[in-house]
């Protein structure tokens, strides 16, 4: 059905936010067009939202500069987070013992792609019907 050939990618490595906290935010923007995704990330009050917004802007810049794509026709094709390093820290407890704290990091990958004309037309028809 969908035949996207042109796509741009941006990766943020070793982000010091736990992957489960990042997943809450990336689930909000998956499949959205760029303007909607930027609006969602701007007004989301999660700690991962500014990091993902910066990553989205980087992917859009890669698409417009390297591939000469129009940013108005782009959408978030895929976005996922992988677990990065775990920094192990010791938290002091009673009687000279200690507990291990694992500070988790994330690797976030975001791919934007050009929608084909049929999908763009369906999206515009759907938005007109909702208004």
Curated annotation (Swiss-Prot):
Protein name, entry field: Large ribosomal subunit protein uL22
Function noted in UniProt: This protein binds specifically to 23S rRNA; its binding is stimulated by other ribosomal proteins, e.g. L4, L17, and L20. It is important during the early stages of 50S assembly. It makes multiple contacts with different domains of the 23S rRNA in the assembled 50S subunit and ribosome. The globular domain of the protein is located near the polypeptide exit tunnel on the outside of the subunit, while an extended beta-hairpin is found that lines the wall of the exit tunnel in the center of the 70S ribosome.
Keyword rRNA-binding: yes
A GO term from the CC aspect: cytosolic large ribosomal subunit
GO molecular function, one term: structural constituent of ribosome
Subunit structure as annotated in this protein's UniProt entry: Part of the 50S ribosomal subunit.
InterPro entries: Ribosomal_uL22 (IPR001063), Ribosomal_uL22_bac/chlpt-type (IPR005727), Ribosomal_uL22_bac/org-type (IPR047867), Ribosomal_uL22_CS (IPR018260), Ribosomal_uL22_sf (IPR036394)
Signal peptide bounds: none
Keywords: Ribonucleoprotein, Ribosomal protein, RNA-binding, rRNA-binding
């Amino acid at each position: 059905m969908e035949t996207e050939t042109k796509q741009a990618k941006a990766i943020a490595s070793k982000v010091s936010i736990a992957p489960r906290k990042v997943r809450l935010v990336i689930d909000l923007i998956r499949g959205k067009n760029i303007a909607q995704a930027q609006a969602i990330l701007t007004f989301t009050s999660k700690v991962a939202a500014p990091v993902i917004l910066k990553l989205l802007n980087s992917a859009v810049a890669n698409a417009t500069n390297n591939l000469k794509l129009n940013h108005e026709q782009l959408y978030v094709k895929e976005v996922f987070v992988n677990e990065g390093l775990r920094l192990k820290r010791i938290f002091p407890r009673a009687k000279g013992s200690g507990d291990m704290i694992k500070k988790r990091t994330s690797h976030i990958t975001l791919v934007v792609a050009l929608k084909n004309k049929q999908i763009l037309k369906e999206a515009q028809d759907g938005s007109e019907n909702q208004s």
